[in-house]
Amino acid sequence: MLEFYGKRFESRLLLGTAQYPSPSILADAVRASLSRIVTVSLRRESGEARAGQDFWALIKALGVAVLPNTAGCHTPREAITTAHMAREVFGTNWIKLEVIGDTDTLQPDPFGLVEAARILCDEGFEVFPYMNDDLIVAERLIEAGCKVLMPWGAPIGSGRGFNNPYALKTMRAHFPDIPLVVDAGIGVPSHAAAAMELGFDAVLINTAVAKAGDPAAMARAFALAVEAGRLAYEADPIEARDMASPSTPLLGKAFL
């Protein structure tokens, strides 16, 4: 069972709530995914108050845990301010911490991320840092107080899967006891299954579901892929070989 900061969940699929064609399609996708955690972005604009109220009513009706994020923040100060606002609005110490360093790739700023994580952890937040796949950055985030890490597979929304599978595999081996969630870049269910087969604890999906032709069907496909990948990992799969190995025994073979 998945566990974050002492809370346990049956599903290992986290779902983002942005970019869906309509609220009803979002709701259908969340239900189809079987996800028990959704990420939400705090809207700092106050213009569409009614739309915001309707959105939160929908999320509450789904009965899922909410993981607010600091999407769009480019400095530690901005991210920290947004985290405080999110705690006030959502009544949770959870925060998915994003400090973006590059506007083209949306690659996280590792220095600003560690700085913000240290401050927020000291203030009692339970931080889920969106990070690259660098082991040293991971070490610094753990030292700062993070008990979950969320390395990217590829740039946000790219659908490329894993740019560096070796780095992700190495991170899993290096931190066997830290919950690891692949966040960003996953495009199709096979990517999610591959992440789970590597031993990752969960995956976070947004664009791949929200922008699909049938979001609910895609959400269901991801749910099945995550379950299959986890079962495969727990089943201890065989090692890849360079040479063939006969699956049919020679015992009893007729020799002519």
Swiss-Prot record:
The keyword Transferase applies. Its EC number is 2.8.1.10. It comes from the Bacteria. GO terms for cellular component: cytoplasm. CDD domains: ThiG. Keywords: Cytoplasm, Schiff base, Thiamine biosynthesis, Transferase. InterPro entries: Aldolase_TIM, Thiazole_synthase_ThiG, ThiG. Catalyzes the rearrangement of 1-deoxy-D-xylulose 5-phosphate (DXP) to produce the thiazole phosphate moiety of thiamine. Sulfur is provided by the thiocarboxylate moiety of the carrier protein ThiS. In vitro, sulfur can be provided by H(2)S. Homotetramer. Forms heterodimers with either ThiH or ThiS. This is Thiazole synthase.
